[in-house]
Curated annotation (Swiss-Prot):
Protein name: DNA-directed RNA polymerase subunit alpha
Annotated NCBIfam families: PRK05182.1-2, PRK05182.2-5, rpoA
UniProt keyword terms in alphabetical order: DNA-directed RNA polymerase, Nucleotidyltransferase, Transcription, Transferase
Comment block on domains: The N-terminal domain is essential for RNAP assembly and basal transcription, whereas the C-terminal domain is involved in interaction with transcriptional regulators and with upstream promoter elements.
Taxonomy, superkingdom: Bacteria
A GO cellular component annotation in the UniProt record: cytoplasm
Annotated source species: Stenotrophomonas maltophilia (strain R551-3)
InterPro entries xref list: DNA-dir_RNA_pol_insert, DNA-dir_RNA_pol_RpoA/D/Rpb3, DNA-dir_RpoA, RBP11-like, RNAP_asu_C, RNApol_insert_sf
Chain segments carrying region Alpha N-terminal domain (alpha-NTD): 1-234
Span list, region Alpha C-terminal domain (alpha-CTD): 248-332
Keyword DNA-binding: no
Subunit structure: Homodimer. The RNAP catalytic core consists of 2 alpha, 1 beta, 1 beta' and 1 omega subunit. When a sigma factor is associated with the core the holoenzyme is formed, which can initiate transcription.
Molecular function GO labels: DNA binding; DNA-directed RNA polymerase activity; protein dimerization activity
Length: 332
């Protein structure tokens, strides 16, 4: 148990209890009284609204002009098929969009496993039923996959210059969040003679494209990033206080693992002693392409991930590395 400068208890590291492959409980304790609900509610909201994921956003089905078309030999109506497609759990290793296809000859059951994927795309719930073919007929689909977060209705994603939708292109309401359910409970905790402390228990279930504990960590990172803007405000008011790490943006001190790059890209960077985001952004494209086993595809992935955070390659940093950052990739 440690105490911060203002005497507020700092909890121990989270304890993880895996319940299933997609569900886990995360326990954080001890917390000051009231902090359980403060942190639990904030984390729950971010988990449900802001964790990025992938979803099917557009569908084209041979012979289908609109959502209300009747297809002979198809047990479900088209609307039900579209609803089933929204529940396909998809993970992409790089990039923000892809186009997949599905072809199946009936009679029989059409499942998510029938979707043709490449090495960059995974279907996590291959047994998920999309539709049933009752006759000797075929179904052919083209599916557009996109990256996003939260829930986005089809109307919100329609381009402003798109006056009319292409006939046969069915736009879906997309739920990008990989988090299916989150609940939290606050229980009593005790440390030595203090019995008025909180224990936060977060029960989280995902669609399998992300681990429950990874989702909680990402939510905590998002909250930390949002709250970090108040740090400068506080320092200005205190006057005498000095920013840590010689004024270096805390984002640059985060390990490259926080970028969620593919394993190949991350290992290539670490092999070149690039451990922090601050190390990475100072490299140029030419320098990175000289890295063994790091090709143009990995370079594109790195540039896209940095751009999402308002960063780019080839940036110049003064006083890097700051005090406390060791060359072996650990904060000293």
């Amino acid at each position: 148990m440690t105490v911060t400068a203002n005497q507020v208890l700092r909890p121990r590291g989270p304890q993880i209890e895996r319940l299933t492959d997609t569900r886990a409980k995360v326990v954080i304790e001890p917390l000051e009284r009231g902090y359980g609900h403060t942190l639990g509610n904030a984390l729950r909201r971010v988990l449900l609204s802001s964790i990025p994921g992938f979803a099917i956003t557009e569908v084209e089905i041979d012979g289908v002009l609109h959502e209300y078309t009747t297809v002979e030999g198809l047990q479900e109506d088209v609307l039900e098929v579209l609803l089933n497609l929204k529940d396909v759990a998809i993970r992409m290793h790089s990039g923000d969009s892809a186009t997949l296809s599905l072809s199946k000859q009936g009679p029989g059951v059409v499942t998510a496993a029938d979707i043709k994927v490449d090495h960059n795309v995974e279907i996590l719930n291959g047994d998920h039923v999309i539709c049933h073919l009752t006759k000797d007929t075929a179904v052919n689909m083209r599916l557009k996959i996109e990256r996003g977060f939260g829930y986005q209705p089809a109307a919100a994603r329609r381009r402003p210059d798109e006056e009319t939708r292409a006939i046969g292109r069915l736009v879906l309401d997309a739920s990008f969040s990989p988090v299916r359910r989150v609940a939290y409970a606050v229980e009593a905790a005790r440390v030595e003679q203090r019995t008025d402390l909180d224990k936060l228990v977060i029960d989280i279930e995902t669609n399998g494209t992300i681990d429950a504990e990874e989702a909680v960590r990402t939510a905590a990172d998002i909250l930390s990033d949002q709250l970090s803007v108040f740090g400068d405000f506080t320092h200005r008011d205190r006057g005498a206080a000095k920013p840590a790490n010689n004024g270096v943006d805390p984002v640059l001190l985060r390990p490259i693992d926080d970028l969620e790059l593919t394993v190949r890209s991350a290992n290539c960077l670490k092999a070149e002693s690039i451990y922090y985001i601050g190390d990475l952004i100072q490299k140029t494209e030419v320098e990175l392409l000289k890295t063994p086993n790091l090709g143009k595809k990995s370079l594109t992935e790195i540039k896209e991930v940095l751009a999402q955070r308002g960063l780019s390659l080839g940036m110049k940093l003064e006083n890097w590395p700051p005090a406390g950052v060791a060359s072996h990739g650990m904060l000293g």
